[in-house]
């Protein structure tokens, strides 16, 4: 949307969620050609860049600096720099701080484009065996008890497929809470997606 002749462009670059071979040629070339890469965790992303011999300068853009850092990045874009945004894994802007930068870019008239690729949300959905035509994405449930209960309660009458991200150490608790709200509903547990030990377990919330 918009963008002036002098402005640079923001590239949202999807990176692998586990298997490095899932990166696209277009993303590799873009990461090599842009002036700057904004990464959620530069210590994590340097491994990816080194693997593909990408020498582009990196800067950190994460949940704790997103508002102020987005302003800095927008200024650099307005000065003509092309910037690529990458997340720790998967597609920027989905359950990560990327949406703030995208919003500020649109407000400033900066052109934003997305380079598609790996996305845990879609990967899990299409191999789950659950209905794919209509779905609801909740990302990670809040850790705050009150907020968490509000969201769980709101799902009680949800008829669409529900996709939730969860960390291994909280998985049992979350499955128990979902069972209390949704009953013995069909569910699929996807682990280690795209990796050597990927597993997909289909059952019900009551049985699992």
How does the language model describe each region?
Residues 3-64:
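Glycine-rich, flexible N-terminal cofactor/catalytic loop recognition
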Residues 8-10, 81-84, 161:
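Loop/turn-to-beta-strand initiation segments
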Residues 31-37, 109-113, 161-162:
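Short active-site oxyanion
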Residues 100-158:
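Class I SAM-dependent methyltransferase SAM-binding "motif I" and its flanking Rossmann-like core
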């Amino acid at each position: 949307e918009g963008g002036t002749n002098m402005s640079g462009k923001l590239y949202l670059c999807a990176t692998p969620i586990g298997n490095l071979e899932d990166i696209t040629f277009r993303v590799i070339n873009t990461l090599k050609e842009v002036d700057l890469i904004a990464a959620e965790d530069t210590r994590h992303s340097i491994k990816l860049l080194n693997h593909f011999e990408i020498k582009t300068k990196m800067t950190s853009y994460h949940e704790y600096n997103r508002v102020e850092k987005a302003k800095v990045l927008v200024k650099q874009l307005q000065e003509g720099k092309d910037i690529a945004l990458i997340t720790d894994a998967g597609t920027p802007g989905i359950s990560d701080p990327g949406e703030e930068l995208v919003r500020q870019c649109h407000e400033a008239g900066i052109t934003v484009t997305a380079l598609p690729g790996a996305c845990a949300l879609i990967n899990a959905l299409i191999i789950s065996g659950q209905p794919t035509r209509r779905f609801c994405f909740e990302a990670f449930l809040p850790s705050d008890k009150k907020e968490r209960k509000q969201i769980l309660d709101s799902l009680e009458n949800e008829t669409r497929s529900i996709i939730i991200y969860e960390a291994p150490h909280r998985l049992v608790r979350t499955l128990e809470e979902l069972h209390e709200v949704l009953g013995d509903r069909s569910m699929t547990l996807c682990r280690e997606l795209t990796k050597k030990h990927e597993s997909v377990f289909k059952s019900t919330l009551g049985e699992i």
